[in-house]
Swiss-Prot record:
Protein name: Mast cell protease 3
Lineage of origin: Eukaryota, Metazoa, Chordata, Craniata, Vertebrata
Statement: the UniProt record of this protein carries the keyword Protease: yes
Function: Thrombin inactivating protease. Displays chymotrypsin-like substrate specificity.
Region Disordered, residue ranges: 1-21
UniProt keyword annotation of rRNA-binding present: no
Length: 21
C-alpha cells in the first residue's frame, strides 16, 4: 500500500494510499 502513495503523489500521501487501494 505504501508503494501506492509513491506511484501517485497526491496532496495527501496517506489519503492517496487508501484511494489507490
Amino acid at each position: 500500500i505504501i508503494g501506492g502513495v509513491e506511484s501517485r503523489p497526491h496532496s495527501r500521501p496517506y489519503m492517496a494510499t487508501l484511494e489507490i487501494t
